[in-house]
Amino acid sequence: MIEKLPELVNNNEALIRRGRWLNDVFLVEVGEIQYLVHVAAGRVECVEIGPFVMPSWTFAIRGSEATWRRFWQSLPAPGDNDLFALRKTGEMTIEGNLKPFMANLIYVKEVLAMPRLLDDKT
């Protein structure tokens, strides 16, 4: 699902505008699979699929495959709909340089929620 972020995000002008100040690479770990998400001026330029030997990223969000599957449901249950709720329960971790993450929090949350649109189509 993460690999579809470029097409999902880059077709959403409001989301691009919200993230226009973010120029970073962040890591998303879904179970054992790592993804590097490259963002430039709010556009997802590409998503690299790991494994990586020594990945360079600014911040990372990690969770089990089951946790991400629940998060990406078109209508997630309460608590499964928010990165911080899942971090609070220990089901996700957020690490690295949190300044760009927090400065662009709504953008990052909306980007990572975009795969929910795919759940509607299945």
Question: What role is predicted for each listed range?
Answer:
Residues 1-122:
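Feature captures hydrophobic
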